[in-house]
Amino acid sequence: MKKSTWKTYAFWILFTEAVGALSGWLTRTGTQIYNETIIQPPLSPPAIVFPIVWGILFALMGIGAARIYLAPTSGARSRSLLLFLIQLIFNFFWSIIFFNFQAYGFAFVWLVALWALIILMIVKFNETDRIAALLQIPYLLWVTFAAYLNLGIFILN
């Protein structure tokens, strides 16, 4: 791997992980309240699962973004990176809406919008780099599961 390629991967992975870490840090109090007081739907995993899964997913997102960034310059590449950044912003704010504001209904609507953005991102990634697109499938599946949990929490609480 070329040094510039290595730096590109490192940047995108670290950037994406940093966004996730900042979101986690900003919601640490809300997360604690959530874990102690919220009625959770069936199939809710233990709290320790979430940071592990998100750490892996943010790394996969970063790898995918790096692959797109390293692709030849094109309109599809630019649109892919823009969608990546937009969905990352939506991802970042979902945690704040859900954990800090405890606005579970609005958080669900926000999450559905994030889900749609992830699908659009996968479609756009696929136009430039199929592997980058495939790397986003676990993210889409996890957000689908998160939507189930979010809706269940909204209904139960």
Name what the model sees in each region.
Residues 38-40, 103-113, 135:
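Non-cytosolic membrane-interface motifs at loop->transmembrane helix junctions
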Residues 3-26:
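N-terminal signal-anchor transmembrane alpha helix
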Residues 123-141:
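Interfacial loop-to-transmembrane junctions
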Residues 75-84:
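Membrane-interfacial loop-to-transmembrane alpha-helix junctions, especially the N-terminal start
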Residues 51-65, 112-115:
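Hydrophobic alpha-helical transmembrane segments
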Residues 29-43, 156:
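Membrane-interface helix termini and inter-helical loops of multi-pass transporters
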Residues 94-106, 127, 151-157:
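Membrane-interface helix caps and helix-loop-helix hairpins in membrane proteins
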Residues 40-52:
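Short aromatic-rich membrane-water interface segments that cap or initiate transmembrane helices
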